[in-house]
Swiss-Prot record:
Organism listed in the record: Danio rerio
The name this protein goes by in its record: Deubiquitinase OTUD6B
Primary role: Deubiquitinating enzyme that may play a role in the ubiquitin-dependent regulation of different cellular processes.
Top EC class of this enzyme: hydrolase
Enzyme Commission code(s) on record: 3.4.19.12
PROSITE patterns xrefs: OTU
Stored InterPro entries: OTU_dom (IPR003323), OTU_OTUD6 (IPR049772), Papain-like_cys_pep_sf (IPR038765), Peptidase_C85-like (IPR050704)
Length: 293
């Protein structure tokens, strides 16, 4: 029979995965900034430190919450045992009526209620946090355009999935794999436009031909996160301008030479614990409903 992981083991496993994911994310961020670009390198160092601090704080809070829950669980269990023993001593007939299974169910229900209360409290505290404030600013910008955020899953493919969603809305059938393949192929065939922006994280030197090929292979065949370099390639492949809306910075447009309707993406720095994420946009629901009516 398989051993069931304890809550502590599950949390430790989750934390290890999140740390590993963060390191992969940081590596991707470093690769996208040239070594000789001191201004962007300085900003990158600050961004990485912030991401690491946020993840560390998140893990610390989760450990505190788990430890608190564990203490309360033991306390509740002892209280329940004390009450049960007293009742059983005063009325032995209750021993048969109150089963151990029922006690476990009651204890679990009480613990779950406590957990839900803590989550609710955390949500209230988060209203003043970076993620919430970023969301408010983006919504304000989008409402002016009669748009709203279209959530895209955070799986490493978010940028490509957001572009895929935009293309689908235009009746263009280009899937995730095809977008990745075409992006990688364009970068391979225009290596001089991309290699100066990619450096080996260990040496700081510009990528060799072999390292660049590995990078392109990852673009095509893995869930490697896509950034501005990949957006540049996608804009050229699709021959469409790509606009990126951000909360605290002006919008940027890649591929302005193409006089066609823009693909619009949302760039979010605080959407998830691991940092950057891309979402798509869709018509504002209330406006869409009015037009349909």
């Amino acid at each position: 029979m398989e051993e069931v992981e304890t809550a502590e083991e599950q949390l430790a496993k989750q934390h290890r995965k999140e740390k590993k994911d963060l390191q992969a994310k940081i590596q991707s961020m470093k690769n996208a900034v040239p070594k000789n670009d001191k201004k962007r390198r300085k900003q990158l160092t600050e961004d990485i430190a912030k991401l690491e601090a946020e993840l560390s704080q998140k893990h610390e809070n989760e450990l505190k919450l788990q430890n608190t829950s564990s203490v309360e669980e033991v306390s509740d269990a002892l209280d329940s045992m004390s009450v049960a023993n007293h009742e059983e001593q005063s009325d032995p007939s209750k021993q048969s009526r109150t089963s151990k299974a029922q006690k476990r169910r009651d204890k679990k229900a009480a613990l779950e209620k406590e957990r839900e209360m803590r989550i609710a409290e955390a949500e209230v505290e988060n209203l003043s946090g970076s993620r919430h404030q970023e969301g408010l600013k983006l919504r304000e910008k989008l409402v002016e355009r009669h748009l709203q955020i279209k959530e895209i899953s955070s799986d490493g493919h978010c940028m490509y999935r957001a572009v895929e969603h935009q293309l689908t809305e235009r009746g263009l059938a280009l899937g995730l794999k095809e977008l990745r393949d075409q992006t990688a192929q364009y970068m391979r065939s225009h290596a001089d436009d991309f290699m100066p922006f990619l450096t080996n994280p260990n040496t700081g030197d510009m990528y060799t031909a072999e390292e660049f090929e590995k990078y392109c292979s990852d673009v095509a065949d893995t869930a490697a996160w896509g950034g501005q370099l990949e957006l540049k390639a996608l804009s050229q492949v699709l021959q469409l301008p790509i606009e990126v809306i951000q909360a605290d910075s002006p919008c940027i447009t890649i591929g302005e030479e193409y006089d066609k309707p823009k693909i619009t993406l949302i760039y979010m720095r605080h959407a998830y614990g691991l940092g950057e994420h891309y979402n798509s946009v869709e018509p504002l629901k209330d406006l869409a409903n009015e037009e349909e009516g």
